């Protein structure tokens, strides 16, 4: 699901709200979450999960074109840990066998 699809679905489900208001709410929420993470804060949404930053230490990488070793600096990356309710909901989904698909 894309952000546009999410906005469209929410606008349909909340018919009393204007589509522009739903668009603004979703974009504001995502902006605030991004800002909180960039400030080093943790975001916890009970039943859904939590967003935090994990530190990746410096490491030695490799340039795929030349095979040359390259020093990569340490960095913080966003991390999502699903909550219990979300994990249980997702685990009940029957997995799709991708080997049966034909193009």
Curated annotation (Swiss-Prot):
GO BP annotations, alphabetical order: DNA recombination; regulation of DNA-templated transcription; regulation of translation
InterPro entries associated with the record: Hist_DNA-bd, Histone-like_DNA-bd_CS, IHF-like_DNA-bd_dom_sf, IHF_beta
Pfam families documented for this protein: Bac_DNA_binding (PF00216)
Disulphides: none
Region (Disordered): 59-82
Subunit organization: Heterodimer of an alpha and a beta chain.
Name of protein: Integration host factor subunit beta
Gene responsible for this protein: ihfB
């Amino acid at each position: 699901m894309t952000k546009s699809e999410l906005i469209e679905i929410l606008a349909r489900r909340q018919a009393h709200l204007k589509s522009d208001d739903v668009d603004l709410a979703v974009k504001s929420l995502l902006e605030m979450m991004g800002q909180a993470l960039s400030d080093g804060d943790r975001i916890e949404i009970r039943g859904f999960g939590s967003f935090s930053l994990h530190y990746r230490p410096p490491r030695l990488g490799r340039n795929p074109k030349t095979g040359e070793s390259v020093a990569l600096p340490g960095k913080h990356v966003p991390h999502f840990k699903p909550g219990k309710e979300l994990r249980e909901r997702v685990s009940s989904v029957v997995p799709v066998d991708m080997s049966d698909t034909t193009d």
